[in-house]
Structures are given as C-alpha cells and as structure tokens.
Amino acid sequence: MWISYLGFLIFYFILAAASYKILKRIKWI
C-alpha cells in the first residue's frame, strides 16, 4: 500500500513539473 501511494505521489509530482514547464514555455511565446 505504501509503495503504491509513494509511486502515485512521484507520478503526480512529475506530471505537475511537466505541466509547469509547458505552461512556462507557452508564456515565453
């Protein structure tokens, strides 16, 4: 259970970081 929760948290963090990068790139344009 803990491993699954940790994996989900890491996946969500990576997704948020990717979305932030994309938004930043769009802002530059």
From Swiss-Prot:
Transmembrane segments: 3-23
GO biological process: one example: photosynthesis
Gene Ontology terms: cellular component: chloroplast thylakoid membrane
Protein localization: Plastid, Chloroplast thylakoid membrane
Keywords: Chloroplast, Electron transport, Membrane, Photosynthesis, Plastid, Thylakoid, Transmembrane, Transmembrane helix, Transport
Domain of life: Eukaryota
Bilayer topology annotation: Single-pass membrane protein
Main location: plastid
Purpose of the protein: Component of the cytochrome b6-f complex, which mediates electron transfer between photosystem II (PSII) and photosystem I (PSI), cyclic electron flow around PSI, and state transitions. PetL is important for photoautotrophic growth as well as for electron transfer efficiency and stability of the cytochrome b6-f complex.
Quaternary structure annotation from Swiss-Prot or TrEMBL: The 4 large subunits of the cytochrome b6-f complex are cytochrome b6, subunit IV (17 kDa polypeptide, PetD), cytochrome f and the Rieske protein, while the 4 small subunits are PetG, PetL, PetM and PetN. The complex functions as a dimer.
The family this protein is said to belong to: Belongs to the PetL family.
The protein, known as: Cytochrome b6-f complex subunit 6
